């Protein structure tokens, strides 16, 4: 893919270390692209990582995660998204594990990951850990991702209610993370509708975004302290994504801010209309010429056939293929906010000029 300076969607991000004096171990990156020189399909890529580990371990792990993932996405052609994500998650996890083993003070470090890869108006997501992805549409909010935590498993098995899970001692026990001894499996389930099952959730990858849709990627510093309906109300009531992002973080901090909090908000403009400029050089002329020759051959064949079968007439009934339009109605989620690990400062990839609002992240040697 080719980097571009501006995104075709509205984006705002904000990160805060919290109120306990700890370092910010959250990292994020947002970058815009087009697929290639011949296909100007716009692409937006966003990733958030919440570092795990004492000393500087969480910061280092989150840095490694974001840098590996963003640079791999940038080098890809943007056409084999799932394969690219699966590969880069393993690579990032292995890099974190190797770095952790190289220094005693970094042992046991890891990171969560939540990413959104938007090609045109098609949404693709993947998560590892308890950083979340939400969709807000038509006055409703839906958690698209599934937490990889002990309490989430307990909720699914009916052992805990969502309300009790929030106060459980194991609320911060994560089942999947980058840097684990065995590379984690990225979760491609996209919970667009309720009760679709894992296979149905995965089939929602590539779902179409609509005007005024808002996506939220966030670390658990937000969702530990702010409920889903509160997130929705803030995003709906604020005049801009910038104000909404800051208000979300401020609310978490006002309730103790015991962890780092990072949010990335992505909205589809109200007047959004996808237009793609394709520059293929001589290709259109070649295709046009070939089509012209083919047309002459077809017409000649028809005339010849008509002369030979003057008294015959053949009519064929054209087939019609209905257009499938997917405009899902999101259902409100009753699952409250849970888990936590560690989080940190705002960053952005160091691959080229970034979309103005964010600083540039520095690579770790």
Please describe what each predicted stretch is:
Residues 1-364:
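PP2C/PPM-type serine/threonine phosphatase catalytic domain
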């Amino acid at each position: 893919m080719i980097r571009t300076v501006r995104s075709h969607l509205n984006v705002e991000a904000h990160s805060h270390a919290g109120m306990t004096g700890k370092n910010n171990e959250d990292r994020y990156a947002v970058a815009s692209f087009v697929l290639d020189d011949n296909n100007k399909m716009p692409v937006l890529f966003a990733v958030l990582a919440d570092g795990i580990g004492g000393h500087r371990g969480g910061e280092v792990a989150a840095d490694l995660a974001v840098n590996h993932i963003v640079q791999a996405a940038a080098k890809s052609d943007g056409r084999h998204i799932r394969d690219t994500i699966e590969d880069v998650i393993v690579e990032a996890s292995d890099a974190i594990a190797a770095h952790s083993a190289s220094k005693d003070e970094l042992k046991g470090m890891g990171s969560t990951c939540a990413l959104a890869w938007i090609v045109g108006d098609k949404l693709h997501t993947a998560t590892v850990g308890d950083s979340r992805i939400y969709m807000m549409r038509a006055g409703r909010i839906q958690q698209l991702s599934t937490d990889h935590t002990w309490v989430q498993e307990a909720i699914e098995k009916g052992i805990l209610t969502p309300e009790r899970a929030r106060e459980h001692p194991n609320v911060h026990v994560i089942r999947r993370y980058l840097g684990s001894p065995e590379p984690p499996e990225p979760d491609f389930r996209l919970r667009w509708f309720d009760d679709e099952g894992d296979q149905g959730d995965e089939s929602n990858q590539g779902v179409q975004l609509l005007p005024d849709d808002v996506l939220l990627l966030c670390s658990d510093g937000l969702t530990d302290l702010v409920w889903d309906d509160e997130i929705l109300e803030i995003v709906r009531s604020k005049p801009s994504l910038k104000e909404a992002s800051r208000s979300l973080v401020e609310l978490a901090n006002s309730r103790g801010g015991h962890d780092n909090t990072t949010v990335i908000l992505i909205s589809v403009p109200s007047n959004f209309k996808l237009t793609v400029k394709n520059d293929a050089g001589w290709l259109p002329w070649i295709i046009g010429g070939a089509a012209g020759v083919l047309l002459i051959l077809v017409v000649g064949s028809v005339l010849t056939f008509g002369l030979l079968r003057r008294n015959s007439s053949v009519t064929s009934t054209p087939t019609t293929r209905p257009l499938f339009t997917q405009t899902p109605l999101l259902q409100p989620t009753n699952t409250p906010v849970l888990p936590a690990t560690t989080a940190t400062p705002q960053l952005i990839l160091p691959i080229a000029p970034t979309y103005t609002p964010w600083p540039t992240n520095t690579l770790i040697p």
